[in-house]
Regions:
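Generic structural signal for well-ordered alpha-helices
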Residues: 62-66, 91, 147-148, 224
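PAPS-dependent sulfotransferase catalytic core
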Residues: 1-81, 85, 97, 101, ...
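Short aromatic-enriched loop/helix-cap "lid" or pocket-rim segments at secondary-structure transitions
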Residues: 90-91, 115-119, 172-175
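Generic structural signal for small/hydrophobic residues in well-ordered secondary structure
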Residues: 22-23, 65, 78, 94, ...
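ATP-dependent NMP and nucleoside kinases share a basic, alpha-helical "lid"
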Residues: 87-105, 144-145, 151
Length: 246
C-alpha cells in the first residue's frame, strides 16, 4: 500500500510562552502522542518571527513558515518558541501567518521563574550573577501584560493557559486537558509522565540580592492580580510567592 503523502500548511498549534516555565518538557510530552509531530528534525523552537523586527514579513515568508510543518493526514504539527509571547511584534505576525492556529502558554510563579533564570545564567556564565539582567528578567515575568497583548491578536478561546506547577502535580490530567484543547483523543492514557528537568534549582534556593524581594513584589504583584482576572482557573495556592493575592 502506498505511503500517505505528506502535506504542509500553517501549524495546528504554537506554544508561545513562557521562558523557564517547563516548555521543553511539555512539548516533549505532547510528542508522545502518535498524531502530534514537530517541525522537520523535531526542532522545538523555530524563532521564525524574530527576523522581522528588522524587515517586513512578505507573503513568501509566510509560505516558508508553512513549509516547515509537514505531516500526514490527521496529524497535527506545531512548534513552541517561548519568546513569541514576550516579543510585542510577534503575535500580529503569527496571526497573519497562522490565523486558525491554537496557542499554548505555560506559566510559572514569576519569582521562581526569575530564580530559575538566574540559576541557569550562573551555571552557564562565570561570574554570571554579576551579568544577570534583573530588569529584563522581571519584564519576562509580566505575564498579564503579555497575555493581554496576545489576546489583541487571538481570541482567548484559541489560547490554552497552563500552570507549570499544576502540570507537575497532575501531569496526566493536564496532558489530557491539552489533548482535548487540540481536539485529539486521549491516546493511551499514561500512568505517569516524564519528570520535568532543567527548570528548578537544586538544593537550597539561590539567593538573589538583598532587599530584592520587596522590589519584585512591587513590580509583579499587580501583574499577578490582573493575570488572575485573565485566567479564572489560575491557582495561586500553587504560587506561594503570590498566595496572599488569592
Amino acid at each position: 500500500m502506498a505511503r500517505r503523502r505528506l502535506v504542509t500548511g500553517p501549524p495546528d498549534f504554537v506554544g508561545v510562552g513562557a521562558q523557564r516555565c517547563g516548555t521543553t518538557w511539555w512539548f516533549r510530552t505532547l510528542l508522545r502522542h502518535r498524531r502530534i509531530v514537530a517541525p522537520h528534525g523535531r526542532q522545538k523552537e523555530l524563532h521564525f518571527f524574530d527576523r522581522f523586527s528588522a524587515q517586513p514579513m512578505r507573503d513568501e515568508d509566510v509560505e516558508a513558515y508553512h513549509a516547515l510543518f509537514q505531516r500526514r493526514p490527521r496529524q497535527l504539527a506545531g512548534e513552541w518558541t517561548p519568546r513569541y509571547m514576550f516579543d510585542p511584534a510577534t503575535p500580529p505576525l503569527l496571526r497573519r501567518a497562522a490565523p486558525e492556529t491554537k496557542l499554548i502558554v505555560m506559566l510559572r510563579d514569576p519569582i521562581e521563574r526569575l530564580r530559575s533564570g538566574f540559576a541557569h545564567r550562573v551555571a552557564r556564565v562565570p561570574q554570571g550573577s554579576k551579568e544577570f539582567n534583573a530588569i529584563d528578567a522581571i519584564e519576562r515575568g509580566r505575564f498579564a501584560t503579555q497575555l493581554e497583548r496576545l489576546y489583541r491578536s487571538f481570541e482567548p478561546e484559541r489560547v490554552l493557559v497552563l500552570q507549570y506547577e499544576r502540570c507537575r502535580r497532575d501531569g496526566v490530567g493536564e496532558y489530557q486537558r491539552t489533548l482535548r484543547f487540540l481536539g485529539l483523543p486521549d491516546h493511551r492514557r499514561p500512568k505517569r509522565l516524564e519528570r520535568a528537568r532543567g527548570t528548578t534549582t537544586t538544593g537550597r534556593k539561590l539567593a538573589l540580592w538583598p532587599d530584592m524581594d520587596e522590589a519584585l513584589h512591587a513590580a509583579l504583584d499587580p501583574e499577578v492580580g490582573r493575570l488572575r482576572d485573565l485566567v479564572p482557573d489560575l491557582d495561586l495556592a500553587l504560587w506561594p510567592n503570590f498566595a496572599h493575592l488569592g
